[in-house]
């Protein structure tokens, strides 16, 4: 709000544009906020790939990137330049228009979702009351990019990978949505700020034990597993199983077009980390009592720490577990996670109307 008012005063009063200046100031402030979100987000993607290689290398008793720049810190930029300057090729019999629309359709929702993600009570582009519903809606659109890319490539490997990815995403989206419905039930809102505020209340209010991860622990586990499968990350990355279908719907893409898919995948990972922090880990709330001074004060710092912890968990999962078979993934989703999710909604409803309600 402070930035918006400053730009509106600048264009309306200082530059003498009147009512037009108020509108221009609003538009400019929104553009500036978008840039402030997107540039750090893209840099985070770059260095997330670096830390992924370092962490997995450490777990496998390797060094990881250590040549390009001090400690390999320039390696992400070398990878970016390599992809940007590679030739973008496509199969002769592919559908040219849809071939290039696919990566854009995958990337656009990953950027658009950040419009409603708050980093603290003030740092948010758009604070709407249906923020969670918006996230579920906008992220579900990315599957269209995968399907379009697989079909337009005119390759059996691409098409099979796209079918696997879309079926897996749709299946685990049900389980993840059921888990998030439980959070909405105990919070009484789909506004992210209200959900975080609700985690500071209840019987254990003001402590780490009041965050949703503990009272909703079974559904928290369902959510974490579903989130990994939803983003097609290991051990649920059968959509690009190298030993079976080469690289799935990525197989015919190179250069900048492949970079868009790569960027979308890692932005969705960071988005899931932010969503996990907001819904289950208290968002910007501190794990320490407020009487401890600065470290007990809610701030964006704690939001970023929790996001980093979830991202590390993603990397640990990839380095630890072998890839599941496709039939095992579908069985886990439909026969285990989805039934648990819907059963817990009923259990939670009974719990909340009982005398043992923890969220009063």
UniProtKB/Swiss-Prot annotation:
GO annotations of cellular component type: plasma membrane
Q: What is the name of this protein?
A: NADH-quinone oxidoreductase subunit H
Asked if the keyword Translocase belongs to this entry, the reply reads: yes
Q: What does this protein do?
A: NDH-1 shuttles electrons from NADH, via FMN and iron-sulfur (Fe-S) centers, to quinones in the respiratory chain. The immediate electron acceptor for the enzyme in this species is believed to be ubiquinone. Couples the redox reaction to proton translocation (for every two electrons transferred, four hydrogen ions are translocated across the cytoplasmic membrane), and thus conserves the redox energy in a proton gradient. This subunit may bind ubiquinone.
Catalytic reactions on record: a quinone + NADH + 5 H(+)(in) = a quinol + NAD(+) + 4 H(+)(out)
A Gene Ontology molecular function term of the record: oxidoreductase activity, acting on NAD(P)H, quinone or similar compound as acceptor
Which HAMAP family does the UniProt entry name for this protein? NDH1_NuoH (MF_01350)
The record's family statement is: Belongs to the complex I subunit 1 family.
Q: State the PANTHER family in the record.
A: NADH DEHYDROGENASE SUBUNIT 1, NADH-UBIQUINONE OXIDOREDUCTASE CHAIN 1
Q: Where in the cell is it found?
A: Cell inner membrane
Which topology term describes how it sits in the membrane?
Answer: Multi-pass membrane protein
Q: Which Pfam families match?
A: NADHdh
* Chief location category: membrane
Q: What keyword terms does UniProt attach to this protein?
A: Cell inner membrane, Cell membrane, Membrane, NAD, Quinone, Translocase, Transmembrane, Transmembrane helix, Ubiquinone
According to its UniProt entry, this protein's organism is Neisseria meningitidis serogroup C / serotype 2a (strain ATCC 700532 / DSM 15464 / FAM18)
List, in alphabetical order, the GO biological process terms annotated in this UniProt record.
aerobic respiration
Q: Which residues form a coiled coil?
A: none
NCBIfam families associated with the record: PRK06076.1-2
The EC number(s) given in the record are 7.1.1.-
- The membrane-spanning stretches of this chain are 22-42, 97-117, 130-150, 170-190, 208-228, 255-275, 292-312, 336-356
Subunit structure of this chain's protein: NDH-1 is composed of 14 different subunits. Subunits NuoA, H, J, K, L, M, N constitute the membrane sector of the complex.
């Amino acid at each position: 709000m402070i930035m918006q008012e400053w730009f509106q005063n600048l264009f309306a009063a200082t530059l003498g544009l009147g009512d037009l200046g108020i509108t221009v100031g609003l538009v400019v402030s929104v553009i500036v906020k978008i840039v402030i979100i997107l540039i750090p987000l893209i840099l985070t993607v770059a260095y997330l790939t670096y830390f992924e290689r370092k962490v997995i290398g450490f777990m496998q008793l390797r060094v990881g990137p250590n040549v390009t720049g001090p400690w390999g810190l320039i390696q992400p930029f070398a990878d970016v330049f390599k992809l940007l300057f590679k030739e973008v090729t496509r199969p002769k019999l592919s559908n040219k228009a849809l071939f290039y629309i696919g990566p854009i359709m995958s990337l656009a929702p990953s950027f658009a979702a950040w419009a409603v993600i708050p980093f603290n009570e003030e740092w948010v582009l758009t604070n709407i009351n249906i923020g969670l519903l918006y996230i579920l809606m906008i992220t579900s659109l990315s599957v269209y990019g995968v399907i379009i890319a697989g079909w337009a490539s005119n390759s059996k490997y691409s098409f099979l990978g796209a079918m696997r990815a879309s079926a897996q995403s749709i299946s685990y989206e049900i389980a993840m949505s059921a888990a998030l419905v439980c959070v909405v039930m105990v919070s009484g809102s789909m506004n992210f700020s209200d959900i975080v505020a609700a985690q500071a209340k209840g019987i254990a209010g003001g402590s780490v034990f009041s965050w949703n991860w503990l009272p909703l622990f079974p559904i928290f586990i369902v959510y974490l597993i579903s989130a990994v499968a939803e983003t097609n990350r290991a051990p649920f990355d059968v959509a690009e199983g190298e030993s079976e279908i080469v690289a799935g719907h990525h197989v015919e893409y190179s250069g900048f077009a492949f970079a868009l898919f790569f960027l979308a995948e890692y932005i969705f990972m960071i988005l899931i980390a932010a969503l996990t922090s907001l819904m289950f880990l208290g968002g910007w709330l501190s794990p320490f009592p407020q009487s401890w001074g600065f470290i007990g004060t809610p701030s964006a710092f704690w939001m970023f720490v929790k996001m980093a912890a979830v991202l590390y968990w993603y990397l640990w999962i990839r380095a630890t577990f072998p890839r599941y078979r496709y039939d095992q993934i579908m069985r886990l989703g439909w026969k285990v996670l989805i039934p648990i999710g819907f059963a817990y909604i009923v259990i939670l409803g009974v719990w909340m109307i009982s005398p043992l309600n923890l969220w009063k």
